[in-house]
């Protein structure tokens, strides 16, 4: 008499690249020793090629300290950083009519939008008034879109010349593309700028709560952060900085030297934002922000810097240990498929959640 059954065993997964062998052995049936040990074991090989890709969102805001409505932009920055500390980057371009002081202007940051102030864009996909609720919703929506490229960068001062910065950016695409049209771009931002007062439409709570500005006067002392100091290819990207043909997980390195403008007040407060422009869509595919350090120090935001969950395939479906967000599965050519009954092959898994978003490549054998 022959009896068969199916059951699942949850495995912790494998870490590291290479071949891994998992062996399962049946030791008892209904609490009794297995009388026939000729078929009580099975072995499966797992090929670990997992690469994590951290998606970061770039918010470009166009504003000015004399704009009475800008407190909502400041509040948006603060709340987005609090909600998404590892996945949110802000750049504030001061260009409010004719009221922007020369010391806050950044003519080389030549990307701009038309509209009323303040206004902003997230990844050049969503454009909106930066009321915090709008900003949080659009940042979350951009994170859920994920990315096809990981990005990291390192920035150091040129030895004996604090007015120049060496920058090296590294991109890793998760999918091969022979007709890619991507370009690197860079910006320098400065935090901690003082000596300005913010016109405040929220003074006394007349327009509701706005990040504490309701408790300040109609002209409030502020510290300006994320201020755009200079841009390098920010509008169209740097031509030929990324080849037309890209291979999956093959690092693409681009190095350049950035000249700092005279408006920079404190070199200890500057950061470099590197981002990748998708020329086909006119959007920003990914971004990273790093502090500028002295030569020999390290300030790098790694492609794999954000911890990502272990991935496993259980019962033909992808599961992620400890991750409570949404898992989406794609074939290697980018087609989304149902997360069930996965056969042998190579897949790309995208996880999107409130606190984390990631992309991993897996091989099911």
Regions found by a protein language model. Name each.
Residues 29-36, 86-296:
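Short, conserved sequence motifs used for protein processing/export or organelle targeting and
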Residues 51-88:
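Local sequence-structure signature of Cys/Sec-based thiol-disulfide redox active-site neighborhoods
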Residues 1-16:
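Intrinsically disordered, low-complexity Pro/Gly/Ser/Thr-rich segments with frequent PxxP/GP/PP motifs
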Residues 36-53, 283-297, 362-364:
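Short beta-strand elements
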Residues 67, 120, 297-304, 316, ...:
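Terminal processing/anchoring signals of secreted or surface-associated proteins
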Residues 344-365:
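C-terminal tail/sorting-segment detector
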Residues 49-57, 291-325:
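Residue-level detector of functionally pivotal "anchor" positions at catalytic/ligand-binding pockets or at interdomain
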Residues 13-23, 262-270:
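Short glycine/proline/serine/threonine-rich loop/turn segments at secondary-structure transition edges
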């Amino acid at each position: 008499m022959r009896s068969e059954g199916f059951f699942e065993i949850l495995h912790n997964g494998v870490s590291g690249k290479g071949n891994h062998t998992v062996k399962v052995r049946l030791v008892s049936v209904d609490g009794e020793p297995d009388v026939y040990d000729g078929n009580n074991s099975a072995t499966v090989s797992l090929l670990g090629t997992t690469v994590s890709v951290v998606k970061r969102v770039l918010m470009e805001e166009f504003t000015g300290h004399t704009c009475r409505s800008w407190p909502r932009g400041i509040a948006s920055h603060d709340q987005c950083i609090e909600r998404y500390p590892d996945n949110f980057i802000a750049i504030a371009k001061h260009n409010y009519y004719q009221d922007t002081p020369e010391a806050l202007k950044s003519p080389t940051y030549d990307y701009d939008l038309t509209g009323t102030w303040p206004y902003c864009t997230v990844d050049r996909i969503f454009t909106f008034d930066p009321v915090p609720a709008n900003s949080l919703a659009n940042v979350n929506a951009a994170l859920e879109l994920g990315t096809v490229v990981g990005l990291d960068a390192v920035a150091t001062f040129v030895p004996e010349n604090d007015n120049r910065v060496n920058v090296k950016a590294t991109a890793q695409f998760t999918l091969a593309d022979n007709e890619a049209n991507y370009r690197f771009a860079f910006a320098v931002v400065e935090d901690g700028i003082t000596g300005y007062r913010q016109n405040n439409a929220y003074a006394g709570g007349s327009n509701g709560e706005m990040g504490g500005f309701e408790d300040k006067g109609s002209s409030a002392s502020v510290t300006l952060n994320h201020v755009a100091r200079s841009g390098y290819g920010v509008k169209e990207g740097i031509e030929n900085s990324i080849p037309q043909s890209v291979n999956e997980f093959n690092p693409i390195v681009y190095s350049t030297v950035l000249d700092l403008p005279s408006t920079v007040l404190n070199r200890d407060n500057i950061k470099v934002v590197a981002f990748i422009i998708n020329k086909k869509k006119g959007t920003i595919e990914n971004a990273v922000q790093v502090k500028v350090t002295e030569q020999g120090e390290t300030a790098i935001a790694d492609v794999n810097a954000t911890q990502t969950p272990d991935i496993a395939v259980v019962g033909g479906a992808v599961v992620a240990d400890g991750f409570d967000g949404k898992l989406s599965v794609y074939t290697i050519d980018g087609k989304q498929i149902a997360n069930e009954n996965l056969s042998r092959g190579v897949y790309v898994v995208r996880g999107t959640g409130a606190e984390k978003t990631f992309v991993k490549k897996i091989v099911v054998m």
